[in-house]
């Protein structure tokens, strides 16, 4: 199965410009009080309500948190909050809180299955505490935390201390139920100050 990622998609029969979209790089999902809580880590563009140019010394990401009856509903609420279409074609990682139920993966991941732009090789992980906490990690070195998460997972796989779990791996279990291992990520306080060269 080969999944292709495309940067072009249409809405109501017309192509959306980059200024009309918000690029989502990472997503956190939790289940609280009968609703899904979604945290989207999105890239700040110059036109997002401000004429101020981007500060290239900062990470230039922001997190939007919304809830809904389904994950798709929560994403749509985030779009209303942002005032723009959320594009999931750049999604690199999806993190889950431990209270999420994966017993019906086809229904659970319908938001991704029905979106032709979502890359089925996107990394999946579990949060040691909450997915929202992971999505709110602020970096100051110009890289996105989604990139750091995927790098941590790949390094763990290389060193034999964890396993990789991609969306396509989990979806492959829909018709043949089985256990799927998923890496767990936790937030650790940095030792020392950035000025000392420690992270």
Predicted regions and their residues:
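Membrane-proximal alpha-helical signals and transmembrane carboxylates
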Residues: 1-199
């Amino acid at each position: 199965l080969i999944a292709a990622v495309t940067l072009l998609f249409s809405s109501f029969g017309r192509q959306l410009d980059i200024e009309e979209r918000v690029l989502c790089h990472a997503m956190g999902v939790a289940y609280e009080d009968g609703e899904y809580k979604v945290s989207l880590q999105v890239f700040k563009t110059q036109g997002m309500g401000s004429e101020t140019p981007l500060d290239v010394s900062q990470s230039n990401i922001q997190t939007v948190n919304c809830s809904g009856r389904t994950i798709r509903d929560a994403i749509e609420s985030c779009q209303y909050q942002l005032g723009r279409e959320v594009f999931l074609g750049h999604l690199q990682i999806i993190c889950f809180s431990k209270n999420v139920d994966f017993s019906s993966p086809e229904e659970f991941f319908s938001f991704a299955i029905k979106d032709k732009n979502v890359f089925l090789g996107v990394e999946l992980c579990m949060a040691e505490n909450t997915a929202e906490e992971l999505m709110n990690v602020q970096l100051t070195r110009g890289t996105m935390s989604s990139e750091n998460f995927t790098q941590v997972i790949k390094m763990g796989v290389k060193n034999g201390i964890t396993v990789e779990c991609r969306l396509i791996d989990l979806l492959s279990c829909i018709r043949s139920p089985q256990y799927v291992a998923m890496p767990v990520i936790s937030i650790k306080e940095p030792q020392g100050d950035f000025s000392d060269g420690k992270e």
